[in-house]
Amino acid sequence: MKKTIPVTLLITLLSYSIACTAQTDHQKIDKYFTNHYEKAKIIGLQVASIGDGELVWQGSYGEKENLSGDMVNDSTLFLMASCTKPVTSLGIMKLYDQGRLDLDDAINDYLSFEVSNPNFPEEKITFRMLLCHTSSLRDNWEVYDSLYTLPEGGDSPLELQLYVKEYFTEGGEFYSPEDNFAKEAPGMSYSYCNMGYALLGVLLEQISDRSFSEYMQKEIFKPLDMKNSYWFLKEIPHKNIARPHEVVPVTGPHVLNHYGYPSFPDGQLRTTAADYAQVLKLMINRGKVNETTFLKEETIEEYLEIQYPDIAKYQALTWNYNELDAFLYKVVAPRYLFMRKLPGHSGYDPGAETFVTFDPKKKTGIIIFLNSEIIQIKGVRIYHQMIKKLFKEAKKAS
């Protein structure tokens, strides 16, 4: 007589087998990061993989502060540096999605003060140009670097709107027609510009009639369920924050104080990999959060479209399709570089490096946050291997 196995038992055994396989896979990638982050001279990091549009794995390794024994966990905040910009742009794109602005509107139609390139005073600057770094505005690094609150640390005492006005208007304390503006007209050349995103922060405030932080908390973070994301140190209700570390070749990592700067919408967000995953999930799931539409599908399509192919062939709205190659600086052999271009963003600030990217078609994404800098070729190669491992983990769920 043939013996039969009940269907319920088969389902139970299959479910158990799948769960064990997933657990084993997660153990493998966890072991990889545990064994390799120190080899790359990384002090502390958070990583995450998104598969099939959902967060499938995250890990935290190393220390918040070198040699402190205070370990990074999944709730530890990391400084985003320029990976802040996609979050800032969400605020602008939400207003666009609601019909409160058009991307090709002149920004001066919304500002209480006027911003124009003195070399082309009649040429309008638009939201699209600011989002794509084609506005003809420039970073004056002498001014920009001098306003970091290092070495003492803390939030900047200089208010955003005042700073931006003094930077872009004639007669302002930080105004320089030679250093703050390009010789090319708006929309005619590409040059990455942090101050353009500070200006977007001011525009968001003036359109919404709220502070940047208040608007982002209520209109972006709350609906996206980002409960551990902050713009200012003074807002953070805990001390679970990764300290930034500058690499000093002879003496070893130098621990920096938590710092800030007045152009904070361009880089000062502190958040976790789990919170930032909500942003990538929004892009991957075409504007939906938990099956609820947060941005229209056509808004996401606009977001991810190359905007100025003749002068910036990889640049979408905020996202760049060549970010990984740019991030790795091409210092490793070509075989280590991705051939397929994906939307992403990288971030660098004193003592901090961040990288996020995603594949809208395969519904995968990865996140890496560091509280130290990678300067050695060996470290860059390990970093690239980490990216590949995270994508591999993401694809298992897709």
Regions found by a protein language model. Name each.
Residues 353-358, 362-372:
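Short, well-ordered beta-strand elements
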Residues 38-46, 67-130, 182-196, 264-267, ...:
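Short active-site loop at a secondary-structure junction
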Residues 311-313, 322-325, 369-398:
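Short, gly/Ser/Thr-rich active-site loops of penicillin-recognizing serine hydrolases
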Residues 24, 28-32, 82, 87-91, ...:
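Extracytoplasmic/secreted proteins, especially bacterial periplasmic and envelope-associated proteins
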Residues 1-25:
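Bacterial Sec-dependent N-terminal signal peptides
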Residues 24-78, 175-181, 252-256:
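Short, conserved catalytic-motif segment at the N-terminal edge
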Residues 20-33, 155-159, 396:
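Sec-dependent signal peptide cleavage junction
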Residues 65, 119-346:
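Short, surface-exposed loop or secondary-structure junction motifs
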